[in-house]
């Protein structure tokens, strides 16, 4: 009997070791081969008005390697700031760092089947160029699946603007005091076989948060906490990137958002300056609702319908999606929430008041006035008609809405500086001196959960 029990114990211990080894291998998946890349053969970098701009071109691995080469210090800073956020989670909610890493590793593996291989290869190139831990880069790519954020976005055109130009404003309101803004860059992509685009974001993250492609399509997103969520799906940053890379118009954007496996609650505003037109997409893990300008489907009493305008904060207009939400006072009406009163209604009221008189400067004022205080990490205004972007990032703990907006012209941005036509007149930068008053932050830093 003693010998039997000993064998049983050894067998059980062996099984545990096998399971542990299998678990470790599952959480640390393999990768593709390293490649020899000359980053300067296709890629390059420049500084525009104090912002690092990296130009990435070629295969996924090449573009990742180019990003890592030209923005190495900022990539390392992104990873360091991300590590700091995990340390902060331990201090604020008692979540040990190893547990936070484990949660992110599991999340990545659950999302992995839905993440295109080209993005995995790009992350590998980024890690190889910088010496960063690939596992940390992977963790950063799924942070949107387990954190919350409050943002806002609007698209206006036609009768709403002075000359029909389509303006698209986007406030990215998240964690301001983690220092992520110190790693801000503009990435200009020319991926093989896909649509070129420009993305305002952070050096160590290959996903997209804000940007516009050369087909005049601008993307934006708003966090909308829901009970209908899943860890299995395509993370937000890659949904937005696929929109820019794959979608030349709104029909394709709608097809994409309906076909991907979504994870948690997000609202999107996507515009096409060629049309001009825009759509709002309200999504949960299992639902997608699509709305256009002045949409008769917006029957909820708190909806603000305006011709030639699409805008969103957290609250959904679709009754089913709204019934699943856990934000903006859900399941009650959103009145009194900062999301509704300051962001959604704030946009709608200002567009109505200035209807037909909105130019770039006025659109920027609407953007700044509806930003959140102490959480406005970056803010972007695009002129989708003329392929222009204005981008501001937070600085020294101060909101992006209070900073200088840097202008980019996508008609010439993809050219090397020596190939660009000379500028014959000063660019119109819509940056009024007096900062607009914004709302206080709603809640504290979202924990990793």
Question: Predicted regions: what is each one?
Answer:
Residues 2-33:
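N-terminal type II signal-anchor transmembrane helix
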Residues 12-13, 176, 349:
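A periodicity- and composition-biased signal for non-globular, repetitive helical segments
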Residues 23-150, 244-449:
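C-terminus-biased signal that marks the final domain/tail of proteins
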Residues 5, 100, 192-194, 198-200, ...:
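Mixed-charge, polar/low-complexity N-terminal
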Residues 142-239, 389-391:
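Internal mixed beta-strand/loop scaffold within catalytic domains of large alpha/beta enzymes
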Residues 4, 13-16, 43, 51, ...:
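Exposed boundary/loop context
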